[in-house]
């Protein structure tokens, strides 16, 4: 497994395959190709009114690619109900290399100077592959996800791959689709010349955020641990 390179990772993602480690200390990586694939439809995200008010209040400030390594470390931290992680040191090194060449990105959410939430993932043409997210304050990861979706829409991305479905994601509009349908969406996305936005702030994305759906009477799932 020592021959895994950033280029090999990108070729794997282009085929719908992604790696995970069995635990934080392992040097081994396994490749995954789920039969049901989680996606967040970029035209069908559900943003409840309470979450929209939080996002639009500007109480939490959002940036991109300011603290990639710190976000990865935070995503790998133990949390209630999750004592182990698939984000090993080797994973962090590989994705750090992808970040330095412009193919992996982070979204950071802060209250004041404190990093309270965020996410990271891989971008490849018109597809963004979400890897992991974290929250240290309630709804911080949801704020990151709303800004991510708004930014991807602005940059003309067509696919947000979440790998699997979770209550947290389905509560915001995430769905699971068959592998064949996913491959079709992926193939289409790889023909698109999307652009990763330079600015993920509320000021830059206000119009795109405001266009997201706000379903009446919908109660979202809570933040993941």
Curated annotation (Swiss-Prot):
Q: Does the keyword Acyltransferase apply?
A: yes
GO MF term list: leucyl-tRNA--protein transferase activity
Q: Name one Pfam family in it.
A: Leu_Phe_trans
Where does it primarily localize? cytoplasm
Taxonomically, the superkingdom here is Bacteria
Q: Which GO terms describe its biological process?
A: protein catabolic process
The keyword Cytoplasm belongs to this UniProt entry's keyword annotation: yes
* Cell compartments where the protein resides: Cytoplasm
Enzyme Commission code(s) on record: 2.3.2.6
Q: Which SUPFAM superfamilies match?
A: Acyl-CoA N-acyltransferases (Nat)
Provide the catalytic activity annotation: N-terminal L-lysyl-[protein] + L-leucyl-tRNA(Leu) = N-terminal L-leucyl-L-lysyl-[protein] + tRNA(Leu) + H(+); N-terminal L-arginyl-[protein] + L-leucyl-tRNA(Leu) = N-terminal L-leucyl-L-arginyl-[protein] + tRNA(Leu) + H(+); L-phenylalanyl-tRNA(Phe) + an N-terminal L-alpha-aminoacyl-[protein] = an N-terminal L-phenylalanyl-L-alpha-aminoacyl-[protein] + tRNA(Phe)
The record ties this protein, via InterPro entries, to: Acyl_CoA_acyltransferase (IPR016181), Leu/Phe-tRNA_Trfase (IPR004616), Leu/Phe-tRNA_Trfase_C (IPR042203)
Sorted UniProt keywords: Acyltransferase, Cytoplasm, Transferase
Q: Which GO terms describe its cellular component?
A: cytoplasm
User: NCBIfam families attached here?
Assistant: aat
Q: Which family does it belong to?
A: Belongs to the L/F-transferase family.
Its annotated function is as follows: Functions in the N-end rule pathway of protein degradation where it conjugates Leu, Phe and, less efficiently, Met from aminoacyl-tRNAs to the N-termini of proteins containing an N-terminal arginine or lysine.
This chain belongs to the protein called Leucyl/phenylalanyl-tRNA--protein transferase
Lineage start: Bacteria, Pseudomonadati, Pseudomonadota, Alphaproteobacteria, Acetobacterales
């Amino acid at each position: 497994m020592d021959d895994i390179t950033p280029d090999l990772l990108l070729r794997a993602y282009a085929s719908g395959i992604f790696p995970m480690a069995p635990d934080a200390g392992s040097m081994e990586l396994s490749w995954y190709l789920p039969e049901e694939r989680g996606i967040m439809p970029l035209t069908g995200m559900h943003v409840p009114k309470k979450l929209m008010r939080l996002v639009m209040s500007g109480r939490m400030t959002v940036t991109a690619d300011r603290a990639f390594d710190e976000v990865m470390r935070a995503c790998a931290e133990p949390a209630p109900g999750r004592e182990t992680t698939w984000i090993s040191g080797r994973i962090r090194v590989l994705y750090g290399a992808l970040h330095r060449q412009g193919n992996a990105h982070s979204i950071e959410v802060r209250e004041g100077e404190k990093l309270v939430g965020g996410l990271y993932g891989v971008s490849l043409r018109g597809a963004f592959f979400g890897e992991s997210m974290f929250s240290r304050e309630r709804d911080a990861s949801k704020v990151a996800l709303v800004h991510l979706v708004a930014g991807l829409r602005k940059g003309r991305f067509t696919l947000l791959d979440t790998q699997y479905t979770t209550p947290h994601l389905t509560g915001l509009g995430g769905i699971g689709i068959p592998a064949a349908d996913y491959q079709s969406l992926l193939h289409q996305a790889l023909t698109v010349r999307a652009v990763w936005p330079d600015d993920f702030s509320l000021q830059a994305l206000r119009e795109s955020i405001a266009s997201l759906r706000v379903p009446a009477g919908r109660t979202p799932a809570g933040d993941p641990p």
